[in-house]
Amino acid sequence: MILAATLYGFKSCSTVKSARKWLDDHGVEYSFFDYRVDRLDPKAVDDWFKRAGWEAVFNRNSTTFKELPEAEKEGIDAKKARAMILAETNLIKRPVLDTGKALLFGFKADAYAAATGK
């Protein structure tokens, strides 16, 4: 059973809203980290890269990424992805659920159930 988890994202994101509703409906204790309100600690990004790989964190499907000049989209590696994410948190797949044991990107009810034991 999860005592506390952290959900990262934007309050206005529909996927984040779905994740928050699921967590609330299933009685999962969590804190919410809003990228627009709080500055993301680079250590969190480093931890996510270490635990999940930068490709799992970096959102190539985001509007922000799609609107980048082609030259900026080329040659992305962990170092470049980290710098881009720290400059623009819209490049993080969201929401991010960190339970301490599980680290999930995006929202899928079955994955949340498995990660939280709910």
Positions of PLM-derived features:
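Thiol/selenol-based redox catalytic cores and closely related redox-interacting motifs
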Residues: 35-118
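Local sequence-structure signature of Cys/Sec-based thiol-disulfide redox active-site neighborhoods
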Residues: 2-26, 30-35
